[in-house]
Amino acid sequence: MPLEIVTVPCLSDNYAYLIHDADAGKTALVDAPEAAPIQSELDRRGWSLDQVWLTHHHWDHVDGLAALRDRYKPTVIGAEADAHRLPPLDLAVSEGDRFDLGGAPVEVLDVSGHTVGHIAFHLPTGKAVFTADSLMALGCGRLFEGTPDQMWASLSKLAALPDDTLVCSGHEYTQSNARFALSVDPDNAALKTRAAEIDQARAEGRPTVPSLLSLEKSTNPFLRAADPGIQSLLGMQGADPARVFAEIRARKDHF
């Protein structure tokens, strides 16, 4: 039976994710913005909580962990590089490490940029990657700690995953990201179609995530810094993609 992935809205615009392996009867949580909606979803489905995967240290991704830990006693997994500023970890992991959720392997990717020590969790058999505030729907996280070179390397790593991978990001920023993307790439037909679909989804109260990696690669300007068309629109033909990415990120910061 395939893994079940459930998007859980938290706080004002955060998302947590529950991953359930029905064959093994095991459930993991990606990030813990607040406990109440996560507990409610677990109760509604009759699931316990076996693992919590933390992507980075920001409060809006960890604030609900203490209550969840008290109730469920899960194994808490996070980045070894971030262990000094994360809640106490039961398992500290780094780039290239693997662990299992029931029968499903989980691969750890270093995606530093938004923070130094940010990690993503890739489920190759579940065809999903949990990116939090690194790669986002039509965007990427602001560079609070890392450099443009680091974030471009992280995004390039994520873009190399299979096209049918679901990108499970950490916030509902997609409408504003779409407006910015159209300012950078106004003639992209796929982007215009996607922006209209996003507006419709939000009007109906539906999440715009997860998104498909193939769609991100064709519409997300932060993944397209090496694209000659984007470079031409920015007046940066032939420039190093990391420099082009830095320019796109700077424009977004002031958009």
UniProtKB/Swiss-Prot annotation:
Q: Which GO terms of the molecular function aspect are on file?
A: hydroxyacylglutathione hydrolase activity; metal ion binding
| Pathway info | Secondary metabolite metabolism; methylglyoxal degradation; (R)-lactate from methylglyoxal: step 2/2
The UniProt record lists the EC number as 3.1.2.6
**Is-annotated flag, keyword Ribosomal protein?**
no
List UniProt keywords, sorted A-Z: Hydrolase, Metal-binding, Zinc
Cofactors required:
Zn(2+)
Check the record and name the HAMAP family matching this protein: Glyoxalase_2
Per its record, how is this protein called by name?
A: Hydroxyacylglutathione hydrolase
Q: Which organism is it from?
A: Ruegeria pomeroyi (strain ATCC 700808 / DSM 15171 / DSS-3)
